[in-house]
Amino acid sequence: SQPTVSRVLKPLIQSGQVRKVGAARAQRYVLPRSVPGVGSQVPVVRVDAQGCASPFARLVPLVGGAFWVEEADGVSARHDGLPWFLDDMRPQGFMGRTFAHAHPELQLGSDPRNWNDDDVLRALALFGDDLPGNLIVGEAAFQRFHTLPQRASRADSAADYPQLAQQAMQGTLGGASAG
């Protein structure tokens, strides 16, 4: 019966081993998991054209590799992998390899095509402060976002561009998008 299930699940919910999601008839129970270096809940913020941030969603990694997404507007859904709205943020191509080279501490390998969803989530959550789109995944990336102006490479004159281009080719240019 429902009361028996609720009674059995209550201590698991309180301990965080099981999470109750949804409301009323749409209520479900999911098994959260922790992604190394990221945790078991990952905030996602939206940055508007003026640079103001607002909550967008919270990602909950689930046992089996799925993700539960609780959007700030009340829409929630289960995704078999990383949600579609993070696809454009996934490091890829030349800039993705540059991103991997710039962050060896991630220990993910030099080719983002070989990264799994947890690897991508870790990269986004720790160093995804300057990627395509208006979303920032994770608290660490959001904190880095606030330091972008200090870290950005600036050209004082046209004569600086060759050196900046060389730095970009070597993967040492700060403040470049990885997309």
What do these predicted ranges mean?
Residues 2-179:
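Phosphate/dinucleotide-binding and metal-coordinating scaffold of catalytic cores
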